[in-house]
Amino acid sequence: MEILHSISDVKKYIKQWKKEGLTIGLVPTMGYLHDGHKSLIERASKENDKVIVSDFVNPIQFGPNEDLDVYPRDLDRDAEVCTKAGASILFNPEPSEMYFDDAVTFVNSSKITDILCGARRPGHFRGVCTVVTKLFNITCPDRAYFGEKDAQQVAVIKRMVRDLNFDIEIVACPIIREEDGLAKSSRNSYLSSEERKAATILSKSLNLAKELLDNGEKNVYNIKKAIIIEIGKEPLAKIDYVEVVDSLSLKSVSKVQQSILVAIAVYIGKIRLIDNFTWNI
């Protein structure tokens, strides 16, 4: 596996691979890779001849009071994960490589980004759409792999690919969880031991919602209320949002009549965690 830092070096490989008729899978990440990322890379390596993993903490998707400066980084560890999972290239650019100082062009999305995490993190999805578009242009992948834990991100990227006519298949991969149910996340490393135990309230509350749905509950108010009450049992937890939306459009629903996404964002101490599940009729 090669570790590359420049766009021009990546493009040299892409040009040769395309010349040879090889398929390319892209796994965009912000590094500090865990088993969730590993599962994306492994799937990409099974479905493509070559796999590029981008390892880039994208500054323009962070807000002014967010964790850009302290976001965990460990390139050596990431390289080991990528090598074992079958990646061909680990692309680790500096921000100055990805963005011109005087750049005036960005990729934005509307409506679908005005809810859930997008409503709480202004500008976040402009940063996501811009960096993903740039990565698509740099790597020319046949397929790109994203985790379902970031459900809104997956929906936004799928819509962007459709709207901008990218000839790329977006592959959404299942959430990978710890043994106690906590969704794998790089931000889990911020949690103290006490907070780590408390964080299981996210998956517990979602499991309760699944039980209600499995037992025939159709009223979204009742589902959300049950989640809120369950999370309220954990003293270290503070709800950011609890939402039930159409799984494709992400529009709010009041009654379960179609495939839905149940999504939550919860602060455990000062650490904001997200989780979700999709329930199909």
UniProtKB/Swiss-Prot annotation:
This protein's GO CC annotations: cytosol
Chain sites annotated for binding beta-alanine: 61
GO MF annotation terms: ATP binding; pantoate-beta-alanine ligase activity
Recorded superkingdom: Bacteria
BP terms from Gene Ontology: pantothenate biosynthetic process
Binding site for (R)-pantoate: 61, 153
Localisation: Cytoplasm
Pathway(s) the chain acts in: Cofactor biosynthesis; (R)-pantothenate biosynthesis; (R)-pantothenate from (R)-pantoate and beta-alanine: step 1/1
Catalytic residues identified in the record: 37
Entry EC no(s): 6.3.2.1
Entry-linked Pfam families: Pantoate_ligase
Principal place of residence: cytoplasm
Reactions catalysed, as given in the entry: (R)-pantoate + beta-alanine + ATP = (R)-pantothenate + AMP + diphosphate + H(+)
Positions with a binding annotation for ATP: 30-37, 147-150, 176, 184-187
UniProt keyword annotations, A-Z: ATP-binding, Cytoplasm, Ligase, Nucleotide-binding, Pantothenate biosynthesis
Misc note: The reaction proceeds by a bi uni uni bi ping pong mechanism.
Function noted in UniProt: Catalyzes the condensation of pantoate with beta-alanine in an ATP-dependent reaction via a pantoyl-adenylate intermediate.
Subunit structure and binding partners: Homodimer.
Family statement: Belongs to the pantothenate synthetase family.
Name of the protein in question: Pantothenate synthetase
Organism: Clostridium acetobutylicum (strain ATCC 824 / DSM 792 / JCM 1419 / IAM 19013 / LMG 5710 / NBRC 13948 / NRRL B-527 / VKM B-1787 / 2291 / W)
Lineage: Bacteria, Bacillati, Bacillota, Clostridia, Eubacteriales
